[in-house]
Structure formats: structure tokens, C-alpha cells
């Protein structure tokens, strides 16, 4: 069974690991690059790296970065008085150095990611949504616009999100294989990532939304538990952008795209407020591979 997952960071990465663990599933993961940013002149792809590290089984204890990493370089950057808010572990830094060197030589992000997957012995294809520069920008009070990492890391998601824009998206094209994977899939799954901040940037790349909307079988997994995000500001961002509360807001965020929505059993009352899509209530907490695989089987009916 060919499956495509649209993924942001930790939640989507954990679901990807569960999908990849099912022998009957031939998985391709398409990942958000709206969070990508330059840090100390290095190209950082947070969501791509989180997905790769998780599939390789080397992700950090919080779901991002590398397991048992050290931070000697960061300590030395502090010595020189450099802005060190966005911390990168030493092992993680090595990947950023490799990617940045390849990009300076003109290699596309998708090609570099294939090489990184081979270094970590990951067989699952992981594709950036685009090789072009697309950046999520956050509109806040006072008509000020922030880069994603400024909002998320430096300002700790404290600003109310008034608007979003995806700079460069209108001129971008899908990375090689992205639309083909969606068109050839038996099912498309939208992972339990933040809908506006992690999935909308993928859909903003011309051709991807259209391919998903045309697909006969698209399921989304809600990132909410008891109406709240387990991690991150998903519930607050959806509310401040005018989406309805709870899983009704998740369904509206994907209006015209999904056939079914998978919600946690704690939110089963939301099923009465959602029209037009099939609702499945199941335990959606995926802390390990086994629970992620069980959720994946339920989504796919395996």
C-alpha cells in the first residue's frame, strides 16, 4: 500500500516512524520547509532533520535534535558573545555544515536529503515540499512580521498570531517526486502537526494543494488532546487566526482536502460539531513506535 504523509516536526515524524514500521506500507514523507532558516550562516531545516532523525532512531529525548548530543560549540559561541538562542548540538551541527556546503555548491535540498538518508541507513523516501526558498512569516500586533524561528524560538511563541504568509511560495515548484508520490499513493495522511504553521506551508507550494484535493483518500490526524496541543501553540494559533475551537478548527483548516479526521478519544464530543468528514476517535498519543504503528493501522484500516 503506497502512503504519502505530509509532515511537520515531532508529531508528524513520530507518525512517520509508525507508518514505516508496517510491512504492508510503502511510505513517502513530504516535509515542511517553511521553518528553514540561516543560523550562523548554516542552512537549518528543523522539520526535515526531525523526520530523518526519528526514522533513523537517533532523535533527541524531546523529539528533536540528536540523542546524547553535546553542546561544546554552543558553549564556545557564548564565549564570543554570539547570539546562541537557537542551540544546535555538535552532532546536529555536523549535518548542518554538510548541508550548507552542498547548497553552496548548488545542490538542491531534495538531493542533499537523499544523501543524508543514506548516511543514516533510512530507506523511506523523505522529500522537502520544495527545493525553492519558502519561508513562513508570522504577522503580529502592530503590522509587524516575524520569521518563524524568531517567533518560535527567540520569542517563545508568546505573540498572538494575527496572520500568516509564505514568502516565496508563489514562485516555488514542488520538489522532484512530490506530486508524483501524491498522485500515485493509495492514501494520503496529514500528520498530527500544527495545521497553519506546519502543513499550510506545504500546501502553499503550487501544485501540492491541488494534488491533495484531487486525491480520493485523504485522512488527517489531529494534533489536539482534550482540545489543546500536547506541544507547541497549535490550538492558540488556530484560534487567533479565526478558526473554530477544538477539532472543528482542525477540520476547517483542511476544508476541501480531507475525507476523514482522526481525533483522540478525549475529544470524542467534537464529533458532533464536525460535518462533511468521517470522524474516527482513537488513542492518538504516539510516544513509541508500537503506539504509532497501531494508530497508523487504524488510519489505514489495516
Short names for language-model regions:
Residues 162-182:
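Active-site glycine-rich loop that binds ribose-phosphate moieties when present
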Residues 1-4:
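Extreme N-terminal starter segment of soluble prokaryotic enzymes
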Residues 16-20, 198-211:
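Short Gly/Thr/Asp-enriched flexible loops that form oxyanion-binding sites at enzyme active sites
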Residues 203-241:
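Redox- and metal-dependent alpha/beta enzyme cores, enriched for Fe-S-associated oxidoreductases
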Residues 231-302:
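C-terminal functional extensions of proteins
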Residues 28-32, 217-224, 260-266:
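Short internal beta-strands
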Residues 21, 31-166:
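Electropositive, gly/pro-rich neighborhoods at or near active sites that engage anionic ligands
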Amino acid at each position: 500500500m503506497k502512503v504519502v504523509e505530509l509532515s511537520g516536526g515531532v508529531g508528524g515524524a513520530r507518525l512517520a516512524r509508525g507508518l514505516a514500521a508496517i510491512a504492508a506500507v510503502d511510505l513517502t514523507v513530504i516535509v515542511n520547509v517553511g521553518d528553514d532558516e540561516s543560523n550562523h550562516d548554516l542552512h537549518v531545516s528543523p522539520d526535515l532533520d526531525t523526520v530523518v532523525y526519528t526514522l533513523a532512531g537517533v532523535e533527541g529525548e524531546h523529539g528533536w535534535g540528536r540523542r546524547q548530543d553535546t553542546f561544546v560549540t554552543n558553549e564556545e559561541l557564548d564565549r564570543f558573545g554570539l547570539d546562541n538562542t537557537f542551540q544546535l548540538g555538535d552532532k546536529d551541527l555536523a549535518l548542518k555544515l554538510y548541508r550548507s556546503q552542498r547548497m553552496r555548491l548548488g545542490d538542491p535540498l531534495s538531493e542533499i536529503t537523499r544523501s543524508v538518508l543514506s548516511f543514516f541507513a533510512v530507506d523511506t523516501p523523505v522529500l522537502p515540499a520544495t527545493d525553492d526558498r519558502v519561508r513562513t512569516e508570522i504577522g503580529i500586533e502592530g503590522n509587524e512580521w516575524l520569521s518563524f524561528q524568531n517567533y518560535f524560538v527567540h520569542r517563545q511563541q508568546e505573540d498572538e498570531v494575527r496572520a500568516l504568509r509564505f514568502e516565496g511560495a508563489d514562485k516555488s515548484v514542488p520538489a522532484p517526486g512530490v506530486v508524483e508520490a501524491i498522485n500515485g499513493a493509495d492514501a494520503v495522511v496529514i500528520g498530527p502537526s500544527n495545521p497553519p504553521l506546519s502543513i499550510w506551508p506545504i500546501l502553499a507550494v503550487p501544485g501540492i494543494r491541488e494534488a491533495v484535493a484531487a486525491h480520493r483518500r485523504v485522512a488527517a490526524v489531529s494534533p489536539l488532546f482534550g482540545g489543546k496541543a500536547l506541544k507547541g501553540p497549535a490550538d492558540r494559533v488556530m484560534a487567533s487566526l479565526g478558526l473554530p475551537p477544538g477539532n472543528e478548527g482542525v477540520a476547517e483548516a483542511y476544508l476541501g482536502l480531507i475525507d476523514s479526521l482522526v481525533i483522540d478519544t478525549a475529544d470524542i464530543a467534537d464529533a458532533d460539531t464536525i460535518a462533511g468528514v468521517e470522524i474516527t476517535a482513537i488513542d492518538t498519543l504516539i510516544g513509541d513506535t508500537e503506539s504509532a504503528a497501531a494508530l497508523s493501522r487504524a488510519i489505514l484500516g489495516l
